[in-house]
Amino acid sequence: MTRSAQWLHAWLLLLPAMALLALFTHYPAVATLWHSFYSTPKGARPVVFVGLDNYRQLGEDPIFWQALSNNLWFALGTIPASMALALLMAVWVNGKVAGRGFLRLAYFTPTVLPMIAVANIWLFFYTPEYGLLEQATGALGFATHNWLGSKSTALACLMVVTVWKEAGFFMIFYLAALQSMSPHLAEAAAIEGASRWHFFRRVTFPLLMPTTLFVLVNAVINAFRLVDHVVVMTRGGPDNATSLLLYYIYEIGFRFWDSAYAAALTMVLLAVLGLAALAQFWFLDRKIHYQ
């Protein structure tokens, strides 16, 4: 096969994936950016070019800034917790423990449940006076508390649900990485007299860095795309205390029908995710050993 034939064959193999990527990713992104510079047609008013007006509106929108702040706190609360719990569970079920298969199933089960089902399960836990959490705290002598109806606890309650949902998913990747490691490494460390903690810190965790980067990227994306739990459990309340960026975009676009402003919000969300991804690869990729 000639070089030109190889080149043509390679591009033909890539063409279906490139077409799907362009159709469902690149074109919507470019169309959203274009739409963010225009107004939303309403009634007899046609679409007009407004330039950066939609972006200027962001600076004067207090709900946007609150949603952005909520999302940043949500990310800071869920990403480290879900990753640490996933790593702990993976190390636990990778060892020789009784009922290892049952533990793996139990840890992974929340991942396969639909998001709406998970939200409804936790609604039962958080129900005032009758919920499981209320029954437990009441037995300990604590006063009744509306967990999802209080601004001080509503966002934290969503964080708990998210960590419970995602930790099992991330555990699978850590478990696969642990099982791909050579057992001779642990044997050599034991001969040298290294403790388990020293072996984990100096050998295991550095070898897990490629997996950690992959999990971190997914955790950041998940933290900024959550909308199901918010819709079912709080609808952004109380007083926008649990309104996250994607939920706010959903409200602007489909409740208030302001598609142009929603497009501008979407571009801000894409910019936040892009900057987060660049920062992760810039700081972590240089510390990763792939071989």
Label each region the model flagged:
Residues 6-291:
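A structural signal for multi-pass alpha-helical bundles of membrane permease subunits
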Residues 1-5:
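Short, Lys/Arg-rich, polar N-terminal cytosolic tail immediately upstream
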